[in-house]
């Protein structure tokens, strides 16, 4: 995971990198090996999965599992440690969040949902909509840059500032899929 990651709490936007999908594939392979049979689907989501827009250099991975309680027990007993840490406080998206950290940097966020959870489904819909609507992707990038300039030192406000736009895009994606 060369040159990917940020120190926890730091906010930085970087240009899109062609190797994000390769880095995701490496992570996917590792996670499938660790969680043998506990993953029903795994996807690259978040801004690094949207072609040609600036993003935080952290790979977002969405895992869906049929048995969330078993997944959590397994993670906390067998996986959590120096490299993988679980965010104990609830997330804004309601997911079970695992951080992968190496060399003092968060390299990936692993968002885990029960299979079929709407938050997981809409994360994929958002990614797909943005990749097929380049004009919206550029608007999203412009919003991210504007929020970054305003909230460089406040990652939470930066994230909250994107919420309304993300919800609008998800609504468009849902309507388009009907």
Each language-model region and where it sits:
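A structural signal for short, well-ordered beta-strand segments
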Residues: 46, 61, 110-114
């Amino acid at each position: 995971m060369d040159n990917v990651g940020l120190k926890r709490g730091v906010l930085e936007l970087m240009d899109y990198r062609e190797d994000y999908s390769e880095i995701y594939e490496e992570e996917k392979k590792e996670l499938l090996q660790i969680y043998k049979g506990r993953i029903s689907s795994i996807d690259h989501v978040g801004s690094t999965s949207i072609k040609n827009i600036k993003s935080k250099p952290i790979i977002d991975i969405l895992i869906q599992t049929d048995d969330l309680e078993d997944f959590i027990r397994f993670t906390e007993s067998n996986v959590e440690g120096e490299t993988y840490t679980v965010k104990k406080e609830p997330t804004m998206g309601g997911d079970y969040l695992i951080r992968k950290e190496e060399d003092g940097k968060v390299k990936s966020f692993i968002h885990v949902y029960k299979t079929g959870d709407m938050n997981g489904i809409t994360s994929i819909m958002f990614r797909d909509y943005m990749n097929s609507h380049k004009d919206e992707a550029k608007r999203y990038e412009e919003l991210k840059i504007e929020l970054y300039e305003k909230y460089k030192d406040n990652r939470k406000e930066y994230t909250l500032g994107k919420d309304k736009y993300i919800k609008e895009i998800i609504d468009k994606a849902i309507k388009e899929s009907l």
